[in-house]
């Protein structure tokens, strides 16, 4: 853990470490935290519309000091948005990725299904998971329902496009026991 000095300017705050001469830039807009640029070994540029999680970074604000701790930066982004939801794609043949403002999903077919991402939502993907952040719960639910309509989920096997908050596995009824003589 290192303590960093804060150098204030008009729109951005520059943080300089005393040991290493590296800069970190944060940008505050309407009392919201937005990460603008991080320079460690290379340069990484983030704008308001992009959403990227960086491992092992988290900050808490003190008077003229910011302390970095070993946690994920996902909590940094959750402060901007009120609602969050996660979709799991369980089964064979599921692939997803984001290209520009479109979400591409392969659901066991030979063609990708393309969804246009609304401006009010932020979406990022892992292997078989889609994370959706937004300002209203209705917009998130509408976008998730469009994705769920693509492939009908099988509740008995637990496969398909699932949201685990509302999902419950249904158990099959046990058959009659056979007698052996």
From Swiss-Prot:
GO terms for molecular function: rRNA binding; structural constituent of ribosome. One of its GO terms (cellular component) is ribosome. Keywords: Mitochondrion, Ribonucleoprotein, Ribosomal protein. The keyword Hydrolase does not apply. GO terms for biological process: translation. It is found in: Mitochondrion. InterPro entries: Ribosomal_uL6-like, Ribosomal_uL6-like_a/b-dom_sf, Ribosomal_uL6_CS. Belongs to the universal ribosomal protein uL6 family. This is Large ribosomal subunit protein uL6m. It comes from Acanthamoeba castellanii (Amoeba). The lineage of its organism: Eukaryota, Amoebozoa, Discosea, Longamoebia, Centramoebida.
